[in-house]
């Protein structure tokens, strides 16, 4: 614990304090649940600022393998802004990542990107958050491709497939998402090998689809359309802007763009991280 100024105290933010941190993301209108906070704080490291017994600022760093760590949840309560809290916590998160010998990555909001650029973060690719209301029709899988429910026994093969295409070692993230929403988890196979997969999770305001990783746009569309065919209520998905065909299909079925993100890194990104060609949906800006 370290005193900053006045009533502000900086201290570690731990999984046991997830419920106390949740109002920060809820106030910002973000989609994370207490379960999401708890997972990220258990798997990664958090730092926060408290005032009068409540959390008024946060930042997290989630390791995604030996080379990469994802910074997220850089939040400051509205009534505590303009006191340097966000900048301080971002610096602390960057230091945590560097001390571990990793490269820092993040998905910046349109408002956040100008804040990150002076720190040395550089753009990789643009992403759009799309919101879809209600179901959409399921599309056929390409010839030779079969889609079935993803089971826990599939995680080693799915994790290896994902790492080779996302440059992220995030098997704990995949296992968490499978546990949160097993009914959404699907795997596509062709010639006895993984050709794609999709996972999802319930959020505070909408169900989030992702990650969606596939060998082709056709496989990705078959996977995501099956999830949407069973949708009840609002669904969100974060799609790299490069995937025009998927975006066109989603737009045709009522998708509305909510906001944009920019994937960024501080330092040289791991090989493949800047390649969005097989990343059709993010796990979310907080999970990579």
Where do the language-model regions lie?
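A generic, well-ordered mixed alpha/beta core segment in the N-terminal half of proteins
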Residues: 90-96, 105-107, 112, 120
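Conserved catalytic-core motifs of GNAT/GCN5-like acyltransferases
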Residues: 103-107, 122-136, 257-269
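Intrinsically disordered, low-complexity, positively biased terminal segments
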Residues: 1-7, 14-19, 39, 50-52, ...
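Conserved active-site tyrosine of GNAT-family acetyltransferases
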Residues: 116-117, 121, 250
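Surface-exposed beta-loop interaction hotspot
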Residues: 124, 129-156, 160-162
């Amino acid at each position: 614990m370290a005193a900053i100024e006045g009533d502000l105290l900086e201290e570690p933010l731990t999984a046991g304090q997830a419920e106390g941190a949740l109002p920060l993301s809820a106030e910002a209108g973000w989609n994370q649940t207490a379960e999401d906070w708890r997972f990220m704080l258990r798997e990664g490291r958090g730092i926060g600022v408290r005032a009068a017994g409540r959390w008024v600022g946060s930042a997290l760093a989630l390791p995604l393998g030996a080379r990469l760590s994802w910074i997220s949840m850089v939040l400051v309560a509205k009534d505590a802004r303009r006191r340097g809290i966000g900048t301080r916590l971002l610096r602390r998160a960057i230091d945590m990542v560097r001390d571990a010998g990793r490269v820092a990555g993040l998905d910046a909001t349109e408002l956040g990107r100008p804040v990150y650029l002076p720190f040395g973060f550089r753009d990789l690719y643009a992403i759009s958050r799309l919101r879809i209301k209600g179901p959409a029709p399921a599309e056929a899988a390409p010839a030779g491709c079969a889609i079935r429910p993803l089971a826990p026994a599939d995680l080693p093969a799915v994790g290896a497939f994902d790492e080779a295409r996302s440059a992220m070692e995030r098997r704990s993230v995949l296992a968490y998402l499978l546990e949160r929403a097993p009914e959404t988890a699907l795997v596509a196979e062709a010639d006895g090998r993984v050709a794609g997969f999709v996972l999802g999770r319930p959020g505070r305001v909408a169900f989030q689809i992702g990650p969606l990783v596939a060998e082709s746009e056709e496989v990705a569309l078959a996977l995501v359309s099956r999830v949407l065919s069973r949708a009840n209520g609002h669904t969100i998905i974060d799609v790299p802007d490069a995937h025009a065909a998927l975006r066109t299909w989603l737009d045709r079925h009522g998708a509305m763009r909510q906001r944009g993100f920019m994937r960024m890194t501080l330092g040289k990104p791991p090989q493949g991280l800047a390649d969005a060609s097989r990343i059709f949906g993010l796990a979310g800006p907080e999970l990579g």
